Amino acid sequence: MSTDEPKTDAQWRAELSPEQYRILREQGTERAFTGEYWDHHANGEYRCAACGAPLFSSSAKFDSGTGWPSFYEALNAQAVRERTDTTHGMVRTEALCSRCNSHLGHVFPDGPPPTGLRYCINSASLSFHPKD
């Protein structure tokens, strides 16, 4: 199968852990303060756990006090796409991997300078790659 063809649900289920599948493919959310990266401070790059696309730099990570990894900007303008999420009786901005369309988390307008944004991302949506 070409890398340009979308994966089937069965392929995603085979490749992802049940928790990753629930979050990445079913728009789930992990409980606060339980994910691997909420208190992670190493220098490197955070990538999509589903497809490996580079998403965030550790230099943009900050402690938001929310219990989820938080970033004030994506790695670049093409890394993360946004769409309106009206689930759970709220209107929010969902963050998705631009490459594979997997759910990452949400974007809120309460972050620090220079952007004022807070990308609130599920740890299960990420893999970390240390800087060499």
Curated annotation (Swiss-Prot):
It comes from the Bacteria. Residues 9-131 form the MsrB domain. One of its GO terms (cellular component) is cytoplasm. GO terms for biological process: protein repair; response to oxidative stress. Keywords: Metal-binding, Oxidoreductase, Zinc. Zn(2+) binds at residues 48, 51, 97, 100. The keyword Metal-binding applies. Its cofactor is Zn(2+). PANTHER family: METHIONINE SULFOXIDE REDUCTASE, METHIONINE-R-SULFOXIDE REDUCTASE B1. This is Peptide methionine sulfoxide reductase MsrB. It comes from Thiobacillus denitrificans (strain ATCC 25259 / T1).
